[in-house]
From Swiss-Prot:
<dbReference type="InterPro" id="IPR028357">
    <property type="entry name" value="UDPglc_DH_bac"/>
</dbReference>
<dbReference type="GO" id="GO:0006065">
    <property type="term" value="P:UDP-glucuronate biosynthetic process"/>
</dbReference>
<dbReference type="Pfam" id="PF03720">
    <property type="entry name" value="UDPG_MGDP_dh_C"/>
</dbReference>
<dbReference type="InterPro" id="IPR036220">
    <property type="entry name" value="UDP-Glc/GDP-Man_DH_C_sf"/>
</dbReference>
<dbReference type="InterPro" id="IPR036291">
    <property type="entry name" value="NAD(P)-bd_dom_sf"/>
</dbReference>
<keyword id="KW-0520">NAD</keyword>
<dbReference type="Pfam" id="PF03721">
    <property type="entry name" value="UDPG_MGDP_dh_N"/>
</dbReference>
<dbReference type="Pfam" id="PF00984">
    <property type="entry name" value="UDPG_MGDP_dh"/>
</dbReference>
<dbReference type="InterPro" id="IPR001732">
    <property type="entry name" value="UDP-Glc/GDP-Man_DH_N"/>
</dbReference>
<feature type="active site">
    <location>
        <position position="269"/>
    </location>
</feature>
<dbReference type="GO" id="GO:0045232">
    <property type="term" value="P:S-layer organization"/>
</dbReference>
<dbReference type="InterPro" id="IPR054886">
    <property type="entry name" value="UDPGDh_AglM"/>
</dbReference>
<dbReference type="GO" id="GO:0000271">
    <property type="term" value="P:polysaccharide biosynthetic process"/>
</dbReference>
<comment type="pathway">
    <text>Nucleotide-sugar biosynthesis; UDP-alpha-D-glucuronate biosynthesis; UDP-alpha-D-glucuronate from UDP-alpha-D-glucose: step 1/1.</text>
</comment>
<dbReference type="InterPro" id="IPR014027">
    <property type="entry name" value="UDP-Glc/GDP-Man_DH_C"/>
</dbReference>
<dbReference type="GO" id="GO:0051287">
    <property type="term" value="F:NAD binding"/>
</dbReference>
<protein>
    <recommendedName>
        <fullName>UDP-glucose 6-dehydrogenase AglM</fullName>
        <ecNumber>1.1.1.22</ecNumber>
    </recommendedName>
</protein>
Amino acid sequence: MELSIIGSGYVGTTIAACFAELGHDVVNVDIDEDIVASLNDGQAPIHEPGLAELVERYAGDRLRATTDYDEILDTDATFLALPTPSTDDGSIDLGAMKTAATSLGETLARKDDSHLVVTKSTVVPRTTVDVIGPRIEEASGKRVGDGLDIAMNPEFLREGTAVDDFLSPDKIVLGAQTDRAYETLAEIFAPLVERAGNPPVVKTGISEAEMIKYANNAFLASKISLANDLANICKVFGVDSAEVLESIGLDSRIGSAFLGAGLGWGGSCFPKDTAAIIAAARAQGYEPRLLQAAVDVNDGQPERMLDLLRERFDLDGKRVAVLGLAFKPGTDDIRKSRAILLIQALLDAGADVVGYDPVATENMRERFPDIDYADSAADALANADAALVATDWDEFAALDDEFDAMRERIVIDGRRIVTRREGLDYESLV
């Protein structure tokens, strides 16, 4: 089929390349001329394992990019994959979505055939039906069900494994209002269903599909926070939390996924999505106490880590290496990274900070241009008084003699990845 994707960030670029891999002809529409040029040159604008190969393979063939909305006219369906950042009260900012919906509607006004518009961005329930659909209707002169269909297809992509997550999904959620919309969605995803071995396809309503995404992320975020809360309790009793969590993960009712206790969750999804659904629930008069508790536990983990360091010395004037700047391994994304909170607190306390990450250094440099950055973990550790491990990159598990170059050889491990060794003042966060 002929597909168009509005937005070429982490989600937009990934789904565009993956749809091309499935045999669809895809045009990526974006207002950023540099990103458009990069995609057309076969260069992925983001770091994501496997994505660069797909973009290079299909650019100029089944995958192209443009700033011109008119190219949407030759496509059968448009996916909206635009950012929905958090506002000060936690609710989502729909500015980019509204602008794109209006521009899309103005374009579709010149199309005679029916067109399907699919919300891919994470939005709270009723957004597609009450905000996006009416905006497209107003600008296009069309009506939903008469020349225009709307749908919701939430993404469940994890940064660092997004390509694999798309091509090997646990489930595919299709939210729509009309039979024609369901039929078009089914045709779009038919190659994926066949390739992935017939994963469950959930056919549901639009608002239900929107809520499924939030419920999914809220559950996972809460599971991590519960693991951290249990691990914090283990620590005060001198109990090995890793053994406890590994054991309960063997229970089929619980499972081992997302039981890795440590510094907590960050990134572009969990913080934003938990804040958004909490704000949306409060706007409807409901206080989501359990979900708020999960956020509170998560927010407290970096401070607990800093307390372990403060127990050893006054931070003022000390050189502290922060190992890992990305919010998780496998990505260069620093959004809501735990390292940001650690670095800011260290600077506020008068510490001298050196950061290291195998891929995210340049992104963090934009946030903290005045701290030092090392080209390797070994360089970061040299002459440091302490090290804080913030991201569980595999290379940190292999560190050994590199610690000998530290002055005081204090290591506080937020991810339980460093191997204990003689001569280290080592403590894990949990």
